[in-house]
């Protein structure tokens, strides 16, 4: 009997406690209007979210009750963007609510992991955000622009191959915008794409995993206490996958691979964000938690791509259904192309950053359809706050939904629900700032989204590329749907795509050249003699491995292989050795690669070329002081063993560690032990502290002979240790020959440029762009594509100088047009070789196209 009484007493106590709690909760916010059920329970919020239309319910509630509405027993929603600075201040004190606790990924072994965007602890947030904030500044993000260019190139190629010329077969353009956003962030974070674009599908189920994560946390965020029971519970996770497990698995795999490569002294790309994350933690082990790189990387994968894709889909959909705005944007882009040389294939940030209508379209897309579309919840601090003339006591959860703030009619006008980019034009600075500050898409105050600049960069580069190269038409726009599960997802953006013709050249207008940067080559009275040796070896190249886009008739290019004899008085060096005569004795993996990808015709050892020379020159293989490899690929290394042991081998940074031991000691090596056997190998360093280190144009350089006559240049990217060379061949006036190695394989990658626009009489008038290079470097082969693109840009600066003659190792247009070994090329400028050969590649392309026709 006593036991029964105790049970009743306990039950009554629990009921009284719950009643007291409900009454207290109801009473403290009793003056705030809202639906009755919402004042008593959070189940009203749960149901709204479960429908996928919570934003519409929120809108209707505010239309009924005003700018401040009670959405739950302790949750208040505000719709007035004028109070954004109050709820989301720059100072600490307004922590995020428990809604964000549900967004921490969970594993049984490590528990819930905080990240920059989901942590509620403001001190921890500062610890996580401060070390990496500078990485997301626009200054740093722009340095990563070549990585976005790499992904743009792949997207364009996939669109061309899969959808252009398919008789207007519709495809899901929304999916492909998402693939681009994810592969761009993958490249920025890991230096490699996830593979969405190449495969045309959701790789590793990442996209579905993120969507599943969002649908879970959207509901749990309304009743966060239940998340601890149902999702973040080590017992429950024995029977179901933890929240965010799939994304964490991808993150952990990338991090473990990178850490392993570092431990094995393998070269990793130190420029991507993962390497920077690891470096930051390693340099501050006492103040930064060991798990921080994992948290930072998780944020990039989870929040850094889907949200960008969301804005891309919004902007594309509205442009396609409102063709007038599409025409206006395309007109602005065409004007930028015509007036400022904006590239069609890879629009530069400098070329697009300040285009007014493009900027207006991006802002309107950010405003109209924010990627996250539930209230951004904050906890009112001690002392309470007053918003919309209503007092909110401490502990109240308050938030503004970006969907409501961004469509506020008092701020954005009566047409705030409509797409109208022109609302952003012709505003005073004060009005423009007011509107921008009223958009809550990226958050506000001290918790503003770190990835904002990355998203803007990607969007402003993507749309010019698409609209200048393609005509896109939406199919069945009524099928375009949206679902709000915290993440405001769109579905059904189907379209057809056609390639736009290249712009016609105006033969009456000569493009004005921009002034290239100064090269600042150190003065010297010393020169060298340069002789181009045509080894006689021909290689059949697949263009898609070396440049994009593909052109009709250029399915195969037969290219020569050049090397160079450099003479400084009685000192002679060779820059490259072409292909060795007995190339089938190379390592088996290289022989197999050669047989599958190319055809070698008439290979010849350079030592034999020198020793069989019947001219009066008299320089033999025994006279060669050093062999300099531009890099260690088979078509440049030749056979050093045919030179005496006294001949030194000079290589670029990192070659020794990555290429030796050679074959057969290392079965996987691409070089032979005999390449270095019995001879000294000297590895060049471009460190500023090294003797002879200098700067030429944008290149780090090393004065080889020490007299200013011959420089080796750090031309990184194509392969480990890739270098170029610059030789001074005359003085008073100075003139130079640049030897580019494999920095690129076709002059169309270098020309035209804004420094060197195409002259009117250069050849085929149907070829594109007088100030935009015909081709872009392909990402297929370079070991460091970012560095390779940067090297090409650096060479363009040299190429624009009338005193520099650029010679690429495989430039077929030079054959029969310039002097070859045993003659010198020192008088190239007097013979006007630069003017006569610079644009021959246009005729080369024209002939290929005509041959295809």
UniProtKB/Swiss-Prot annotation:
Its cofactor is heme. Residues 1-6 are lumenal. It is found in: Endoplasmic reticulum membrane. GO terms for cellular component: endoplasmic reticulum; endoplasmic reticulum membrane. It is a single-pass membrane protein. SUPFAM superfamilies: Cytochrome P450 (SSF48264), Metallo-hydrolase/oxidoreductase (SSF56281). It holds the Pfam family Lactamase_B. GO terms for molecular function: heme binding; iron ion binding; monooxygenase activity; oxidoreductase activity, acting on paired donors, with incorporation or reduction of molecular oxygen; polyketide synthase activity. Pathway: Secondary metabolite biosynthesis; terpenoid biosynthesis. Its EC number is 1.-.-.-. Gene3D superfamilies: Cytochrome P450, Ribonuclease Z/Hydroxyacylglutathione hydrolase-like. Cytochrome P450 monooxygenase; part of the gene cluster that mediates the biosynthesis of mycophenolic acid (MPA), the first isolated antibiotic natural product in the world obtained from a culture of Penicillium brevicompactum in 1893. MpaDE' is an endoplasmic reticulum-bound enzyme that catalyzes the conversion of 5-methylorsellinic acid (5MOA) into the phthalide compound 5,7-dihydroxy-4,6-dimethylphthalide (DHMP). This is Cytochrome P450 monooxygenase mpaDE'.
């Amino acid at each position: 009997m006593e036991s029964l009484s105790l049970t009743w007493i306990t039950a009554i106590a629990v009921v009284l406690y719950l009643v007291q709690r409900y009454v207290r909760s109801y009473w403290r916010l009793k003056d705030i209007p809202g639906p009755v059920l919402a004042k008593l329970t959070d189940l009203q919020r749960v149901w709204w979210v479960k429908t996928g239309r919570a934003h519409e319910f929120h809108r209707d509630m505010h239309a009924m009750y005003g700018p401040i509405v009670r959405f739950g027993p302790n949750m208040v929603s505000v719709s007035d963007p004028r109070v954004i600075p109050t709820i989301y201040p720059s100072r600490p004190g307004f922590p995020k609510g428990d809604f964000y606790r549900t967004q921490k990924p969970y594993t049984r072994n490590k528990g819930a992991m905080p990240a920059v965007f989901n942590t509620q602890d403001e001190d921890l947030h500062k610890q996580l955000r401060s070390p990496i904030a500078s990485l997301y500044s626009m200054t740093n993000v722009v340095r990563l622009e070549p990585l976005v260019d790499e992904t743009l190139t792949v997207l364009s190629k996939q669109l061309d191959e899969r959808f252009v010329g398919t008789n207007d077969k519709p495809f899901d353009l929304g999916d492909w915008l998402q693939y681009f956003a994810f592969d761009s962030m993958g490249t920025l974070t890991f230096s490699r794409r996830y593979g969405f674009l190449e495969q045309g599908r959701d790789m590793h189920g990442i996209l579905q995993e993120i969507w599943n994560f969002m649908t879970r946390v959207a509901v749990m965020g309304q009743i966060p206490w239940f998340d601890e029971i149902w999702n973040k519970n080590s017992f429950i996770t024995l029977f179901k996958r933890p929240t965010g497990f799939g994304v964490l698995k991808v993150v952990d795999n990338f991090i473990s691979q990178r850490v392993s490569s570092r431990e094995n002294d393998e070269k990793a790309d130190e420029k991507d964000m993962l390497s920077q994350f690891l470096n930051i933690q390693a340099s501050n082990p006492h103040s930064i938690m060991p798990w921080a790189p994992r948290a930072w990387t998780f944020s990039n994968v989870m929040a850094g791509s889907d949200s960008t894709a969301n804005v891309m889909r919004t902007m594309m959909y509205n442009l396609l259904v409102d063709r007038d705005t599409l025409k206006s944007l395309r007109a602005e882009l065409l004007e930028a192309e015509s007036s400022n040389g904006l590239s069609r294939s890879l629009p530069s940030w400098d070329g697009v950053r300040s285009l007014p209508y493009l900027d207006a379209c991006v802002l309107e897309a950010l405003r109209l359809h924010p990627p996250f579309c539930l209230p951004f919840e904050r906890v009112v601090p001690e002392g309470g706050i007053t918003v919309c003339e209503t007092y909110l006591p401490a502990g109240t959860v308050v938030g503004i939904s970006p969907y409501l703030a961004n469509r506020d009619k008092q701020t954005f006008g009566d047409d705030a629900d409509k797409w109208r980019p022109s609302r952003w034009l012709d505003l005073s600075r004060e009005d423009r700032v007011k509107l921008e500050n009223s958009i809550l898409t990226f958050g506000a105050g001290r918790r503003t989204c770190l990835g904002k600049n990355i998203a803007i960069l990607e969007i402003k580069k993507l749309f010019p590329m698409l609209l200048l190269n393609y005509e896109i038409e939406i199919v069945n726009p009524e099928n375009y749907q949206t679902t709000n599960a915290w993440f405001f997802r769109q579905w059904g953006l189907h379209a057809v795509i056609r390639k736009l013709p290249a712009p016609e050249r105006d033969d009456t207008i000569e493009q004005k050249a921009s002034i290239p940067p100064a090269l600042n080559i150190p003065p010297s009275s010393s020169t060298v003699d340069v002789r181009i040796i045509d080894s006689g070896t021909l290689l059949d190249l697949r263009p898609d491995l070396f440049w994009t886009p593909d052109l009709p008739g250029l399915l195969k290019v037969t290219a020569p292989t050049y090397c160079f004899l450099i003479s400084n008085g009685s000192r002679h060096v060779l820059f490259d050795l072409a292909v060795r005569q007995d190339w089938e004795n190379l390592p088996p993996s290289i022989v197999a690669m050669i047989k599958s990808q190319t055809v070698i015709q008439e290979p010849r050892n350079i030592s034999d070329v020198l020793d069989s020379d019947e001219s009066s020159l008299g320089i033999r293989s025994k006279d060669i002081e050093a062999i300099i490899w531009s890099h260690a690929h088979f078509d440049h290394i030749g056979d050093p063993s045919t030179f005496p042991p006294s001949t030194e081998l000079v290589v670029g940074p990192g070659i020794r560690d990555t290429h030796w031991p050679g074959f057969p000691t290392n079965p996987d090596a691409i070089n032979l032990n005999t390449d270095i056997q019995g001879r000294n190998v000297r590895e060049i360093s471009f460190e500023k502290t090294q003797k002879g280190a200098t700067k030429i144009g944008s290149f780090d350089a090393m004065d080889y002979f020490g007299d200013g006559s011959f420089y080796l240049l750090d031309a990184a990217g194509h392969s480990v240790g890739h270098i170029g060379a610059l030789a001074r061949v005359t003085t008073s006036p100075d003139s130079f020959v640049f030897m580019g190695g494999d920095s690129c394989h076709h002059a169309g990658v270098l020309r035209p440029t804004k420094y060197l626009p195409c002259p009117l009489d250069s050849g085929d008038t149907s070829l594109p762009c007088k100030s935009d290079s015909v081709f872009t470097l392909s990402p297929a082969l370079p070991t460091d594509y970012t560095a390779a693109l940067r090297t090409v840009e650096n060479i363009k600066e040299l190429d624009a100088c009338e005193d520099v003659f650029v010679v690429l190792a495989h430039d077929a247009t030079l054959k029969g047009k310039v002097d070859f070994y045993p003659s010198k090329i020192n008088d190239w400028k007097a013979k006007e070789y630069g003017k006569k050969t610079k644009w021959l590649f246009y005729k080369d392309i024209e002939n290929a196209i005509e041959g295809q026709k």
